[in-house]
């Protein structure tokens, strides 16, 4: 009997530990997709962001879930809000949440749980401040900046939290360590002007907007956890996720899809730090970073020496590794172990220079996140902006083998979109690889002065949600097919290289306007994460890159360089735009060697400079962006690096955007006309298929269209209205 029971339990364990279909890459046939896409499973959304505010009760949630369902929502992202009749994370709250999940289940809706009572994620409704203050976020700061001149002694006391005291020469940036004796310094500078900087560690948090904060403001009264400390994240999971598991764990992987995080970052004046940082830094880099800290904490505008810039890049390299391993990975692992997915978006996705300071490295942070995301707020995506940043989330999914990438859309939009503009904003993201949609904002009807976002009141809105549901499902099926990789120059940005950032953003635009489907990859992907083949790099999703483009970068690792060389030797195309990197790093960036011409003799290099692309704005711009003028040398080099593009037009059109996916027996092409003019072009697409079909996402109708085929391509006429999408299936 014991043997039988053990066998049954083993089978049950195997079944429950297996990934659900929506959690893994699926390769159905086009016929199988056609059978399902008219009414896709609820796991593919869309979902509103729902705030449990005010005197919320069972009557309220039933009414609100019914409204969501009638609009066409198939899932809901739910956050504990303000003014609830029970305390957040209390037994009463979890009893109510159990009821909420049961009501969603009755309606065959799925639930994503917001992991905190506001944002950024990681304060557990104030519990770190109240109960675990030693696990709060910490930083290194300049506690004192003392001017000093030759011959005048600097005498002062320093606090017990002092890490280092360093004098910095005002003329050349050289530094001198200052000895601390009995919590005091006594130092006389040599000639010239100096600043003595006292570096301390302190508990310092990014501001949090918590619905448990009685002041209803975004401030530092409820501290975030120490993101760099796995023990702090373990405590966070105990405060939050484990309690949900006790209350509703039987619905994990069934009604409950996973946990949703929001903008974890270091929006602080100082350097991200944790007590284990220096030991970890020495383990990774092999040297002591403390002598350089004061240079990093100089007043705004201070110029760092080349050596200091390199050491600072090492600091942010280690910071980003510790952020990934201390915060994102434990949550992704916990969700996977509990049959769930972790979805999260960061801050500053559209401003990578800022992101490298606050979060380190986008793709590194997202490596173990099952559903990487972005958010689009303010005026970031509109008909008068250039916004390719959603491709970051899709690329993280593609590189690391996850089927979906999500968007939080429409929060704090200026102006608020109507239904037509909402469709445009979502289509801009679909064609860049996003395939799971969360919309802002649906407050509980118990919320004082509650009102849904205005576009939700439009009679045309349910039709848009039907469209979104089908598009999300269709673009989640199969695998990505991008054959071009664009390098994200985070390590150059760690050294303050704004030119590399600007070139990266404009190269995104260049490729998009030339209908070149691409993924974004980082140094870690090139150095080790991608599977190297003969003239190809393969992602965990199965798409293979035949070309890698590196835009105007100043730094590259030796490991990435070596693998790029082997890739090119096998027939892959490697293209440097503008310049080749001047530095090649090994274990450290501090000791990076100077690059030589022979390092890149095997690669293509296109001289010239791309014009900057405007950053997606917070407010409507005074005028739309001007047309992108690409230097001839760069345009020709890109064409040579991508000799067999997925899509070729008989006449160029920079308004057309495309993305390609691969089903078991068919190619999927999504076209989006982002321009205000109708488009009529003969289009040639790569495919071994013989039959071309147009799939109408709004009506679910499928019609065969006239096409001719030759040598692995299909040619057809493409006619599109302004701001229209077209789905082409070739099988």
Model-assigned labels for residue ranges:
Residues 80-201, 205-209, 214-234:
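Acidic/aromatic-lined carbohydrate-recognition and catalytic surfaces
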Residues 13-17:
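N-terminal signal peptide c-region/cleavage motif recognized by signal peptidases
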């Amino acid at each position: 009997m014991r043997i039988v029971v053990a066998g049954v339990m083993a089978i049950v364990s195997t079944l429950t530990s297996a990934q659900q279909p929506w959690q893994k890459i699926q390769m159905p046939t086009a016929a199988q997709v056609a059978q399902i896409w008219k009414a896709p499973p609820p796991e593919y959304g869309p979902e509103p962001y729902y705030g449990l505010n005010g005197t919320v009760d069972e009557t309220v949630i039933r009414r609100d879930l019914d409204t969501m369902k009638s609009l066409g929502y198939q899932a809901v992202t739910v956050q504990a809000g303000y003014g609830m009749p029970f305390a957040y994370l209390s037994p009463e709250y979890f009893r109510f949440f159990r009821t909420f999940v049961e009501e969603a289940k009755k309606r065959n809706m799925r639930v994503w749980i917001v992991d905190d009572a506001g944002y950024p994620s990681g304060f557990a409704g104030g519990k770190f401040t109240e109960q675990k203050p030693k696990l709060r976020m910490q930083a290194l700061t300049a506690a004192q900046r003392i001017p000093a001149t030759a011959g005048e002694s600097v005498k002062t006391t320093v606090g017990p939290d002092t890490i280092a005291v360093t004098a910095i020469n005002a003329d050349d940036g050289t530094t001198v360590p200052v000895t601390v004796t009995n919590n005091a310094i006594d130092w006389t500078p040599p000639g010239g002007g100096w600043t003595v900087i006292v570096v301390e560690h302190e508990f310092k948090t990014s501001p949090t907007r918590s619905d448990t904060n009685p002041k209803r403001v975004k401030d530092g009264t409820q501290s975030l956890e120490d993101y760099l400390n796995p023990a702090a994240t373990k405590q966070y999971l105990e405060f939050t996720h484990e309690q949900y598991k006790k209350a509703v764990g039987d619905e994990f992987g069934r009604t409950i899809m996973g946990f949703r995080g929001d903008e974890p970052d270091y929006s602080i004046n100082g350097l991200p730090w944790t007590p284990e940082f220096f030991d970890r830094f020495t383990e990774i880099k092999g040297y002591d970073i403390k002598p350089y800290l004061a240079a990093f904490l100089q007043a705004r505008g201070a110029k760092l020496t080349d050596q200091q810039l390199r050491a600072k890049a090492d600091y942010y390299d280690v910071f980003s590794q510790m952020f990934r391993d201390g915060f994102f990975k434990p949550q992704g692992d916990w969700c996977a172990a509990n049959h769930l997915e972790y979805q999260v978006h960061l801050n500053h996705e559209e401003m990578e220079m800022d992101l490298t300071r606050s979060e380190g490295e986008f793709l590194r942070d997202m490596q173990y996140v099952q559903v990487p995301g972005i958010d689009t707020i303010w005026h970031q995506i509109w008909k008068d902006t250039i916004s390719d940043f959603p491709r970051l989330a899709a690329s993280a999914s593609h590189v690391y083998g996850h089927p979906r990438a999500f968007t939080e859309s429409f929060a704090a939009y200026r102006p608020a979109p109507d239904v037509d503009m909402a469709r445009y904003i979502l289509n801009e993201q679909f064609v860049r690889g996003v395939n799971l949609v969360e919309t802002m904002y649906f407050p509980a009807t118990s919320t004082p002065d509650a009102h849904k976002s205005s576009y939700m009141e439009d009679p045309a809105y349910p039709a848009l949600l039907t469209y979104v549901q089908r598009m999300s499902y269709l673009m989640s099926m199969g695998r990505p097919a991008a054959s071009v990789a664009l390098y994200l120059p985070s390590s150059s940005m760690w050294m303050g290289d704004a030119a590399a950032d600007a070139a990266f953003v404009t190269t995104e635009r260049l490729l998009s306007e030339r209908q070149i489907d691409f993924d974004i990859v980082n140094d870690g992907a090139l150095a080790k994460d991608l599977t190297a083949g003969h003239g190809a790099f393969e992602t965990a999703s199965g798409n293979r890159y035949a070309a890698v483009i590196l835009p105007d970068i100043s730094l590259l690792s030796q490991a990435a360089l070596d693998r790029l060389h082997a890739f090119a030797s096998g027939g892959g195309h490697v293209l440097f735009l503008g310049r080749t990197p001047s530095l090649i790093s090994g274990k450290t960036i501090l000791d990076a060697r100077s690059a030589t011409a022979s390092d890149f003799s095997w690669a293509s290099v296109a001289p010239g400079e791309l014009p900057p692309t405007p950053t997606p704005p917070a407010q409507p711009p005074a005028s739309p962006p001007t047309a992108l003028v690409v230097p001839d040398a760069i345009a020709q080099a890109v064409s040579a690096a991508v000799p067999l593009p997925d899509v070729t037009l008989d006449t160029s059109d920079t308004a057309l955007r495309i993305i390609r996916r691969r089903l078991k027996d068919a190619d999927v092409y999504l076209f989006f006309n982002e321009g205000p003019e109708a488009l009529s072009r003969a289009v040639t697409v790569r495919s071994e298929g013989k039959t071309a079909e147009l799939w109408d996402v709004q009506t679910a109708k499928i019609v065969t269209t006239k096409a001719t085929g030759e040598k692995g391509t299909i040619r057809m006429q493409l006619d599109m209205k302004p701001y229209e999408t077209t789905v082409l299936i070739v099988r």
